[in-house]
Amino acid sequence: MGSYPKSINASSLNDWFNSEKEDPVLIDVREQSELEIARFSKEFLHIPISKVTFEYVEEIFAGLLDREIVVTCHAVIRSYNFSQWCLDNNIVREIWNLEEGIDGWSRYIDPSIPRY
């Protein structure tokens, strides 16, 4: 049986950022044009889904293997697919997917982020 991405909602991720635990690495897989519309106020890595190759992602993740990783997009589909791809290609053993993406983050945590 294969592995699947873990799910985390906006409220739980916000609690994590505000806890004593080390912050997770937030990865946004939306395209650059989407970042220009709505951007996380938290620090994040940008890996546009259109640029994903095994070598590119493996190189970026090489320095993150001791960190928890949370992936996001606009609503959840691309981030889930990217997370599953990372697991299927043995790039990571565990990865989190933000339920409802930046849209959920805007609705529940930071209404200053535009919704689109």
Per-segment meaning from a language model:
Residues 72:
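Short, surface-exposed ligand- or partner-binding patches at beta-edge/loop junctions that are enriched
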Residues 1-24, 32-68, 77-116:
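Rhodanese-like catalytic fold shared by cysteine-dependent sulfurtransferases
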